[in-house]
UniProtKB/Swiss-Prot annotation:
Localization: Secreted
Residue positions assigned to the propeptide: 20-56
Signal peptide positions on this chain: 1-19
Main location: secreted
Residues modified to Methionine amide: 68, 107
Gene: Tac1
Protein name: Protachykinin-1
Molecular functions (GO terms): substance P receptor binding
Originating species: Mus musculus (Mouse)
Gene Ontology cellular component list: axon; extracellular region; extracellular space; neuronal cell body; neuronal dense core vesicle; synapse
Keyword Methyltransferase: no
Domain of life: Eukaryota
High-level lineage: Eukaryota, Metazoa, Chordata, Craniata, Vertebrata
Record keywords, A-Z: Amidation, Cleavage on pair of basic residues, Neuropeptide, Neurotransmitter, Secreted, Signal
SMART domains, sorted: TK
Example GO biological process: associative learning
Length: 130
């Protein structure tokens, strides 16, 4: 047991001495050496630079999956404006089918008009009671 303690103390002392030798060789202007962007580019190896670029890039639109599902890869502002014009009668009717009497959200399908929703809720309640 005493041998293990002696080895541990020797190891700690040798690492402390080694760290002091490294500290003595360092300049005080360490951070000012890296201020030039050319030095950073030269010092950074190519795979590391490529890795940083991959981390920093934004996800492509087709890679984004939100709460409402997958987005179209070709969706744009112009398409959204054309869709709004078609809905409000200022343009041609789009090929997409729009249901205005129901809404599908996180809690499931809901009717937008309250009378139909109450009727379907009562029918579901009656079916469960039987």
């Amino acid at each position: 047991m005493k041998i293990l303690v002696a080895v541990a103390v020797f190891f700690l002392v040798s690492t402390q001495l080694f760290a002091e030798e490294i500290d003595a060789n360092d300049d005080l202007n360490y951070w000012s050496d890296w201020s030039d962007s050319d030095q950073i580019k030269e010092a950074m190896p190519e795979p590391f630079e490529h890795l940083l670029q991959r981390i920093a890039r934004r996800p492509k639109p087709q890679q984004f999956f939100g709460l409402m599902g997958k987005r179209d890869a070709d969706s744009s502002v112009e398409k959204q404006v054309a869709l709004l014009k078609a809905l409000y009668g200022h343009g041609q009717i789009s090929h997409k089918r729009h249901k205005t009497d129901s809404f599908v959200g996180l809690m499931g399908k809901r009717a937008l008009n309250s009378v139909a929703y109450e009727r379907s809720a009562m029918q579901n309640y009656e079916r469960r009671r039987k």
